[in-house]
Amino acid sequence: MENANTLHFRVAGLKFSVSSDASVSELQKLMPSYRLFYEKDATDDAPLFELFVHIAGECDVPAPAEGRLLHTFDEPDIIQEFYAEPQGGHGIRIYTHPRSLAAILHASEDWRQARAEIFGGKDTQSYALGNVIMMLYALTALEANALLLHASVVEHSGKGYIFQGKSGTGKSTHSRLWLKYIPDTALLNDDNPVVRLMPDGTVRVFGTPWSGKTPCYINRSVPVGAFVRLFQAPVNKIVLMQPPLSGASIIGSASGMRWDKEFYTRMLQLSFSIAKQTGIFTLHCLPDE
């Protein structure tokens, strides 16, 4: 899939490439948050995945969906449909509300070879491409003992503190309070960090090109200090979690195909392995400073 219009990236130490029939400069304009993750020179290590992107024109008519619908994510800003394609491999369709097609993805059985068409204006194309890359990363990085999380992370005294919780619980707010009141604290990522169990058995958290509405795209990693799952409550209380709840707390924020038994089992195994190496807490807290 390598051609002259190929960009190489490395996130959490793991390489992937994005190619296009458009120019490199046009592709880069759709990927401003990836600037610090770009690798100028190709390396010999095998990429997690290779993605080819076609930027659809106004006259391009998308083909109808084929195959068996496996799962649908319907969230406030986006709909994602996962298909098993008739000839093997995977298909994903991404829509923005109200059901406007933003991207079509076709991927090999192991997700390592993929082709995407992205539609709409430049903002929609950039959003769709980011979602395609995030999904491919989450689905292939598991084999390298890495999990893409929905969380907010601060760095304090050389360690990363990962705030988890349901949407609206206050993950970003909690990070901002640390930045405001605790010296020597910096934001590492505000929406989608990567946590990786390293070959030496340590657990590190990495900044990524994906940080939600907060432009925090930092290419750096630190050892994990703790995972903290937040709950709004009438009292302030922090509790150290024990297995198996500690591992379940991690996977509760991880991205992946939960409906696929084999994939979900591997997610569970990695989550429990990570939980053995670091502290996992629940923090019940008042909605104030």
Locate each region found by the language model.
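A noncatalytic interaction/capping subdomain that flanks phosphate/NTP-handling catalytic cores
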Residues: 1-162, 167, 177-186, 194-289
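Hydrophobic positions on the alpha1 helix immediately C-terminal to the Walker A/P-loop
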Residues: 174
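Conserved glycine(s) of the Walker
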Residues: 170
